[in-house]
Each structure stands twice: as structure tokens, then as C-alpha cells.
């Protein structure tokens, strides 16, 4: 799977989501089904988008006791999506259980979905880390430690900000994947995101994949913005 550009399909209405995808009929898309879409449309949206041939990231960010996460991953494996995720904060035993569940649920002849762990959300800043979560280490240090823990647990990669990708690449194996949301063009509103970069910056920093939502989904001309951002992503030089 090379260098996905996942569009986050965070829509509050089935019709809006359908109209949006219809306007992209000429493009081969990678899409992300997040909590909003999944809790609204359920498994039917996964089946529909899978049958339509999209590369799928099912972003449900599991975070629970190891037994529950393992059994849930076993169920999710049957959906045959490309990427699923957990929160690294659930710890090593939980991540190992997630991987075991995913392995056990993957049907013969199918490829196991890639399993990645959210390190620190891209909406989290240093103040929140220290004052709300009571983590007294620097953001970079926390993210790299969580990435190492994910790697030790056998996971394929992490979700992080592109800012942290060079440090993760130095600390983890070459094959370890970095999926980076918090992507904006210079002209876009940042909104609730904190650790933000452009697609070109993400590529230059070494991100394996980017995740883009509102810059495209809330744009007046989503297709034009997608093409502009994809050009920036594909065209940038990796350092
Ligand atoms: O796991 C994710 O996809 C994720 C992790 C993270 O740290 N930050 C983050 O923004 N995301 C998701 O990426 C998408 C970003 O959307 P926009 O901020 O609209 O581009 C949303 O669907 C988030 O749920």
C-alpha cells in the first residue's frame, strides 16, 4: 500500500456523504470511516465503500481492557478493511491482544488489516499534556515512547503529527508506518487541531500517509481542494 491520502468522511448525513463521493467519481480515493460516520451508518457503510473499491481506514480508536479489544478486533477483521486503530494509551497488553484478535479474525487468503496506534491526538498540546493528563514529559518524548511501545507490541505503525515523524523514524524500524492527521493548507482554518502541517510538509517530514477532513469536506469545491492538496502531497520531496 503506497502513500495513502485518506479523506476523512466525517459527515452528519448519508445524503451529504453520497453526494460528496459522487463528485469524486473520476478519482481513485483512499477514505477514512471515523466514529461519526460509523455510529450513524453502521456496518452498511463499511460494506458499501468496500464493495465500491475504496482503500479503507476504519478509525474506531479502540481503547478498553485487552480481552474486549482483542475480541472486538477479531470481529473487525472480518470486514476486510485496510487499516484499523487503537489508542496506544491502552498499553502493551491491549495492543498485543488487538493484534492477536486481528490475526485470528482475518479470513484465509485475505490480508490482515494494518494495525496502528494513536500516540497523542493531534488536537493535544503541551499544556493539556502537562495540566490535564498529568504527563510531565515533552510531547516528542511521549509520542516516541508510545510509538516504540506500539512497535514492541507488533503493530504496523502509529497515528501522530507529522512534526514527530522524523523522531519516530529514527527510533523505530524503517517499515514502521506513520499516519498523520492535522493536515491543513496555509489558507485553511486550523479549528480544533494543534499540531498541524501542510501535505507537502508532511511528505518532507516522512509521513507514510496523511488524513484530511474539513479542508476538503467543508470546501466550496472539494474536488479542486483535494487535487491541490494531493498535488502538494505527491509532488513534495521527502527529506
Ligand atoms: O485517528 C485519527 O484519524 C485521528 C487522530 C488524531 O490524532 N487526530 C485526528 O484528527 N484524527 C482524525 O483525523 C481527521 C481529521 O479531520 P480534520 O481535522 O477535519 O482534517 C478526523 O477524522 C479525526 O478523527
UniProtKB/Swiss-Prot annotation:
Keyword Lyase: yes
Family: Belongs to the OMP decarboxylase family. Type 1 subfamily.
InterPro entries for this protein: Aldolase_TIM (IPR013785), OMPdecase (IPR014732), OMPdecase_AS (IPR018089), OMPdecase_bac (IPR047596), OMPdeCOase_dom (IPR001754), RibuloseP-bd_barrel (IPR011060)
Enzyme class: lyase
Pfam family, one: OMPdecase
One GO cellular component term: cytosol
Binding residue positions for substrate: 10, 32, 59-68, 122, 184, 193, 213-214
UniProt-recorded Gene Ontology molecular function terms: orotidine-5'-phosphate decarboxylase activity
Pathway field: Pyrimidine metabolism; UMP biosynthesis via de novo pathway; UMP from orotate: step 2/2
Function comment: Catalyzes the decarboxylation of orotidine 5'-monophosphate (OMP) to uridine 5'-monophosphate (UMP).
SUPFAM superfamilies tied to this protein: Ribulose-phoshate binding barrel
Enzyme Commission numbers on file: 4.1.1.23
Protein name as catalogued: Orotidine 5'-phosphate decarboxylase
Subunit structure: Homodimer.
UniProt source species: Shouchella clausii (strain KSM-K16)
Amino acid at each position: 500500500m503506497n502513500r495513502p491520502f485518506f479523506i476523512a468522511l466525517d459527515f452528519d448525513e448519508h445524503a451529504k456523504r453520497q453526494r460528496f463521493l459522487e463528485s469524486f467519481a473520476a478519482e481513485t480515493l483512499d477514505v477514512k470511516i471515523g466514529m461519526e460516520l460509523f455510529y450513524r451508518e453502521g456496518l452498511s457503510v463499511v460494506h458499501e465503500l468496500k464493495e465500491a473499491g475504496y482503500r479503507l481506514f476504519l478509525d474506531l480508536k479502540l481503547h478498553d481492557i485487552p480481552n474486549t479489544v482483542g475480541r472486538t478486533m477479531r470481529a473487525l477483521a472480518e470486514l476486510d478493511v485496510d487499516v484499523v486503530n487503537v489508542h496506544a494509551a491502552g498499553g502493551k497488553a491491549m495492543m498485543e491482544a488487538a493484534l492477536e484478535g486481528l490475526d485470528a479474525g482475518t479470513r484465509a487468503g485475505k490480508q490482515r488489516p494494518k494495525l496502528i496506534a494513536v500516540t497523542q491526538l493531534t488536537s493535544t498540546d503541551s499544556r493539556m499534556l502537562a495540566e490535564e493528563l498529568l504527563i510531565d514529559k515533552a510531547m516528542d518524548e511521549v509520542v516516541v515512547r508510545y510509538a516504540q511501545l506500539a512497535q514492541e507490541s507488533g503493530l504496523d505503525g502509529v497515528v501522530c503529527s507529522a512534526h514527530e515523524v522524523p523522531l519516530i523514524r529514527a527510533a523505530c524500524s524503517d517499515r514502521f508506518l506513520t499516519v498523520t492527521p492535522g493536515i491543513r493548507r496555509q489558507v485553511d482554518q486550523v479549528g480544533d487541531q494543534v499540531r498541524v502541517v501542510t501535505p507537502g510538509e508532511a511528505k518532507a517530514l516522512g509521513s507514510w500517509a496523511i488524513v484530511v477532513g474539513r479542508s476538503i469536506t467543508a470546501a466550496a469545491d472539494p474536488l479542486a481542494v483535494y487535487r491541490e492538496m494531493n498535488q502538494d502531497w505527491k509532488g513534495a520531496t521527502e527529506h
